[in-house]
């Protein structure tokens, strides 16, 4: 069953922007391991709070990504940029929806010009 992994990250003092850049970079690499999508959220009320969300069809693909060389290097390189422990949660996707975005329609003036 397809799953969504949620990984909460909390940056240490003055490291939020650096952690954001690295989370964006390493999240994009997840598709090499079979991820079907990813999102990185940053809190508006708390700019040090991040949520990395990755979707995989197979839990084993997630395990390969998390233990792979890129994520290992990320955790070594960014050591001290985030609070530990980092505890992720695998969730089964049971329902999904998405709004269809349409281009706005501009009405013509009543006189036709």
Positions of predicted regions on the chain:
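Short S/T/G/P-rich N-terminal loop/turn motif that feeds into the first structured element of a domain
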Residues: 1-72, 83-113
């Amino acid at each position: 069953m397809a799953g969504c992994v949620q990984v909460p990250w909390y940056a240490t003092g003055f490291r939020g922007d650096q952690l954001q850049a690295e989370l964006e970079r390493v999240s994009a690499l997840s598709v090499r391991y079979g991820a079907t999508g990813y999102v990185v959220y940053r809190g508006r009320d708390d700019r040090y709070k991040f949520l990395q969300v990755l979707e995989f069809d197979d839990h084993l693909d997630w395990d390969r990504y998390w233990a792979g060389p890129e994520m290992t290097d990320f955790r070594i390189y960014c050591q001290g940029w985030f609070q530990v422990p980092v505890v992720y949660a695998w969730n089964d996707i049971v329902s999904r929806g998405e709004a269809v975005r349409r281009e706005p329609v501009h009405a013509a003036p009543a006189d036709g010009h």
